[in-house]
């Protein structure tokens, strides 16, 4: 299986390239979508974020704007948020790759 990774800065066309691969039927793992899903559905993520960034989780909803204010511009806070999210994103990517290896998918994209 060929694993193609899309990398680059903001505005470099990664999302456009991912859409093109999807249109050709190539499975694409979208790390941004995984983060969004974690922020919406993962209760442990909610708990971890609430503990580290008080006032950013209301009930079962992460206030993304409040979290952004707490994190961006503060490198240590950003690293703390990444420490909560990145291991889970890596696990999701590993599950995606395992699934497609079993299926015999010839090409997948990690975005």
Q: In which residue ranges do the predicted regions lie?
A:
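The conserved Walker
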Residues: 10
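ATP-dependent small-molecule kinase phosphotransfer cores
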Residues: 33-107
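Walker A/P-loop
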Residues: 15
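Short coil/loop residues immediately preceding or within conserved phosphate-binding loops
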Residues: 1
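Post-Walker A helix-loop "phosphate-sensing" segment adjacent to the P-loop in P-loop NTPases
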Residues: 22-31, 43-44
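Structural recognition of the conserved hydrophobic beta-strand(s) that form the central parallel beta-sheet
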Residues: 109-111
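Hydrophobic anchor at the beta1->P-loop junction of P-loop NTPases
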Residues: 4-6
């Amino acid at each position: 299986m060929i694993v193609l990774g899309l990398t680059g800065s903001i505005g470099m066309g990664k999302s456009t390239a991912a859409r093109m691969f999807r249109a050709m039927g190539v499975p694409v793992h979208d790390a941004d979508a995984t983060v969004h899903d974690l922020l919406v559905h993962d209760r442990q993520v909610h708990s971890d974020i609430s503990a580290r960034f008080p006032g950013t989780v209301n009930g079962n909803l992460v206030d993304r704007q409040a979290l952004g204010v707490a994190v961006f511009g503060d490198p240590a806070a950003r690293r703390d948020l990444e420490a909560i999210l990145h291991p889970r994103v890596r696990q999701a990517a590993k599950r995606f790759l395992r699934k497609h290896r079993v299926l015999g998918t010839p090409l997948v994209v990690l975005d």
